Amino acid sequence: MSTFSAKPAEVVHEWFVIDATDKVLGRVASEVALRLRGKHKAIYTPHVDTGDYIVIINASKLKVTGTKSLDKVYYRHSGYPGGITATNFRDLQAKHPGRALEKAVKGMLPKGPLGYAMIKKLKVYGGAEHPHTAQQPKALEI
Protein backbone atom coordinates (compact mmCIF):
# COMPACT_ATOMS: atom_id res chain seq x y z
CA MET A 1 0.00 0.00 0.00
CA SER A 2 1.40 3.38 -0.97
CA THR A 3 1.05 6.73 0.77
CA PHE A 4 -1.87 8.85 -0.43
CA SER A 5 -1.05 12.22 -1.93
CA ALA A 6 -3.81 14.65 -2.89
CA LYS A 7 -3.78 15.99 -6.43
CA PRO A 8 -4.68 19.68 -6.88
CA ALA A 9 -7.34 18.84 -9.47
CA GLU A 10 -9.07 16.36 -7.13
CA VAL A 11 -9.39 18.72 -4.15
CA VAL A 12 -12.85 20.17 -3.50
CA HIS A 13 -12.76 23.59 -1.83
CA GLU A 14 -15.89 24.29 0.20
CA TRP A 15 -17.11 27.69 1.40
CA PHE A 16 -17.80 28.43 5.07
CA VAL A 17 -19.05 31.56 6.84
CA ILE A 18 -18.10 32.40 10.43
CA ASP A 19 -19.88 35.00 12.56
CA ALA A 20 -17.15 36.58 14.70
CA THR A 21 -19.51 38.44 17.05
CA ASP A 22 -18.08 38.36 20.61
CA LYS A 23 -15.48 35.73 19.68
CA VAL A 24 -11.88 35.91 20.93
CA LEU A 25 -9.37 36.92 18.24
CA GLY A 26 -6.80 34.14 18.75
CA ARG A 27 -9.31 31.31 18.97
CA VAL A 28 -11.00 32.35 15.73
CA ALA A 29 -7.64 32.89 14.00
CA SER A 30 -6.26 29.47 14.92
CA GLU A 31 -9.38 27.64 13.70
CA VAL A 32 -9.43 29.66 10.47
CA ALA A 33 -5.73 28.98 9.82
CA LEU A 34 -6.31 25.25 10.34
CA ARG A 35 -9.19 25.22 7.84
CA LEU A 36 -7.36 27.38 5.28
CA ARG A 37 -4.51 24.84 5.30
CA GLY A 38 -6.90 21.89 5.05
CA LYS A 39 -5.58 20.09 8.13
CA HIS A 40 -9.13 19.19 9.17
CA LYS A 41 -9.48 16.94 6.10
CA ALA A 42 -8.35 13.34 5.81
CA ILE A 43 -6.77 14.12 2.41
CA TYR A 44 -4.42 16.78 3.84
CA THR A 45 -1.14 16.91 1.95
CA PRO A 46 1.49 19.50 3.02
CA HIS A 47 2.50 20.56 -0.50
CA VAL A 48 -1.06 20.86 -1.91
CA ASP A 49 -3.64 23.53 -1.12
CA THR A 50 -6.42 21.35 0.34
CA GLY A 51 -8.05 24.11 2.41
CA ASP A 52 -11.46 25.70 2.19
CA TYR A 53 -12.68 29.25 1.60
CA ILE A 54 -13.57 31.10 4.79
CA VAL A 55 -15.82 34.18 4.93
CA ILE A 56 -15.79 36.02 8.25
CA ILE A 57 -18.58 38.48 9.02
CA ASN A 58 -18.92 40.94 11.92
CA ALA A 59 -15.13 41.16 12.30
CA SER A 60 -15.58 44.57 13.90
CA LYS A 61 -17.16 42.82 16.91
CA LEU A 62 -14.12 40.62 17.66
CA LYS A 63 -12.75 40.91 21.17
CA VAL A 64 -9.52 40.27 23.00
CA THR A 65 -9.19 39.27 26.64
CA GLY A 66 -7.78 41.33 29.47
CA THR A 67 -6.24 44.71 28.65
CA LYS A 68 -4.93 43.64 25.25
CA SER A 69 -7.18 46.14 23.47
CA LEU A 70 -4.76 48.82 24.65
CA ASP A 71 -1.62 46.72 25.24
CA LYS A 72 -1.48 44.74 21.98
CA VAL A 73 0.54 46.83 19.53
CA TYR A 74 0.88 46.42 15.76
CA TYR A 75 3.97 47.93 14.15
CA ARG A 76 4.65 48.96 10.57
CA HIS A 77 7.56 50.76 8.98
CA SER A 78 7.55 53.18 6.06
CA GLY A 79 11.09 52.31 4.99
CA TYR A 80 12.45 55.72 5.94
CA PRO A 81 14.66 56.35 8.99
CA GLY A 82 12.46 56.90 12.02
CA GLY A 83 9.43 55.79 10.05
CA ILE A 84 8.05 53.24 12.50
CA THR A 85 4.38 53.57 13.43
CA ALA A 86 2.64 51.79 16.30
CA THR A 87 -1.11 51.17 16.56
CA ASN A 88 -2.95 49.38 19.35
CA PHE A 89 -5.74 46.83 18.79
CA ARG A 90 -8.60 49.19 19.64
CA ASP A 91 -7.48 51.86 17.16
CA LEU A 92 -6.77 49.30 14.44
CA GLN A 93 -10.26 47.76 14.85
CA ALA A 94 -11.86 51.21 14.73
CA LYS A 95 -10.05 52.23 11.55
CA HIS A 96 -9.83 48.86 9.72
CA PRO A 97 -12.22 46.23 11.12
CA GLY A 98 -10.82 42.77 10.52
CA ARG A 99 -7.24 43.81 9.79
CA ALA A 100 -6.09 42.40 13.14
CA LEU A 101 -7.72 39.06 12.32
CA GLU A 102 -6.08 38.99 8.87
CA LYS A 103 -2.66 39.67 10.43
CA ALA A 104 -3.19 36.98 13.08
CA VAL A 105 -4.21 34.34 10.52
CA LYS A 106 -1.42 35.31 8.11
CA GLY A 107 1.14 34.80 10.89
CA MET A 108 -0.18 31.26 11.44
CA LEU A 109 0.09 30.20 7.79
CA PRO A 110 3.24 29.02 5.98
CA LYS A 111 5.43 31.65 4.38
CA GLY A 112 5.93 31.06 0.66
CA PRO A 113 3.84 30.62 -2.49
CA LEU A 114 1.48 28.05 -0.95
CA GLY A 115 0.84 30.21 2.12
CA TYR A 116 0.13 33.24 -0.07
CA ALA A 117 -2.42 31.19 -2.02
CA MET A 118 -4.04 30.11 1.26
CA ILE A 119 -4.44 33.64 2.63
CA LYS A 120 -6.26 34.66 -0.57
CA LYS A 121 -9.05 32.25 0.40
CA LEU A 122 -9.80 34.30 3.52
CA LYS A 123 -12.51 36.95 3.11
CA VAL A 124 -13.06 39.27 6.09
CA TYR A 125 -15.92 41.78 6.41
CA GLY A 126 -16.56 44.17 9.29
CA GLY A 127 -20.34 44.07 8.94
CA ALA A 128 -22.96 41.35 8.61
CA GLU A 129 -23.19 41.54 4.80
CA HIS A 130 -20.88 39.77 2.35
CA PRO A 131 -20.93 39.38 -1.47
CA HIS A 132 -20.38 35.60 -1.47
CA THR A 133 -23.98 34.37 -1.24
CA ALA A 134 -23.70 32.84 -4.73
CA GLN A 135 -21.16 30.34 -3.36
CA GLN A 136 -23.73 29.21 -0.72
CA PRO A 137 -21.33 29.14 2.24
CA LYS A 138 -22.19 26.84 5.13
CA ALA A 139 -22.34 28.29 8.63
CA LEU A 140 -19.40 27.23 10.79
CA GLU A 141 -19.62 27.55 14.57
CA ILE A 142 -16.43 28.04 16.57
Curated annotation (Swiss-Prot):
GO cellular component, one term: cytosolic large ribosomal subunit
Source species, domain of life: Bacteria
GO molecular function: mRNA binding; structural constituent of ribosome
InterPro entries in the record: Ribosomal_uL13 (IPR005822), Ribosomal_uL13_bac-type (IPR005823), Ribosomal_uL13_sf (IPR036899)
Function, as annotated: This protein is one of the early assembly proteins of the 50S ribosomal subunit, although it is not seen to bind rRNA by itself. It is important during the early stages of 50S assembly.
Assembly information from the UniProt record: Part of the 50S ribosomal subunit.
Name this protein carries in UniProt: Large ribosomal subunit protein uL13
